[in-house]
């Protein structure tokens, strides 16, 4: 962030070049004084080199400090970090979540393998697995690329604290596979199993 100024309760962050934000995105600012400018901020407007966000109670003027910004984290917790190369276990960290765990095995060249568990005791062991081995041996498939090469593939991730959509274009172009993992709005109050995992069999 090159400059950060406040006027009338609206903060404007200006960048030396382009930025990744769009209206409605949540950015995480750090390093600013006054401290009320730090934290997760919903983006109100954008130009090619600036963004604005609400700064209620912050006095007008220029902020000081080494100010940084990045996309705000969605609030998922990594379990068993570094326990197995190219394998990750994630679960929502908010207290109202089901607590179900997503396990992603990203060792394959063109597909990742995914499973969900009610709980996991280590990176390879869990209870309440879905899909069952009898339903999809090895888990569901999440496509990454149609070919095993270094060609970049477009992807989009939209996440909140309880679930995320992942859209991947494995063959390139604008044909995406839409995937989901996370809690759903259950019709049953207090549904401890209101979790959905999609993928290919």
Which stretches of residues belong to each language-model region?
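Small/polar beta-strand repeat architecture
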Residues: 1-10, 19, 31-201
């Amino acid at each position: 962030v090159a400059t950060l100024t406040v006027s009338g309760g609206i903060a404007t962050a200006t960048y030396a070049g382009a930025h990744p934000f769009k209206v409605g995105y949540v950015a995480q600012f750090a390093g600013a004084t006054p401290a009320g400018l730090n934290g997760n901020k919903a983006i109100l407007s954008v130009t090619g080199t600036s963004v604005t966000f609400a700064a209620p109670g912050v006095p007008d003027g220029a902020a000081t400090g080494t100010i940084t910004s990045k996309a705000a984290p969605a609030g998922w917790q990594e379990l068993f970090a570094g326990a197995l190369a190219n394998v990750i276990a994630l679960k929502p960290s908010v207290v109202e979540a089901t607590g179900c765990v997503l396990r992603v095995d990203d060792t394959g060249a063109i597909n990742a393998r995914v499973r969900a568990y009610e709980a996991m005791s280590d990176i390879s062991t869990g209870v309440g697995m879905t899909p069952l081995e009898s339903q999809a041996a090895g888990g569901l498939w999440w496509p990454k690329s149609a070919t095993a090469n270094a060609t970049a593939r477009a992807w989009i991730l939209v996440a909140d604290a309880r679930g995320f959509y992942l859209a991947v274009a494995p063959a390139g172009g604008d044909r995406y596979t839409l995937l989901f993992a996370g809690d759903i709005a259950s019709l049953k109050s207090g549904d401890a199993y209101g979790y959905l995992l999609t993928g290919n069999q």
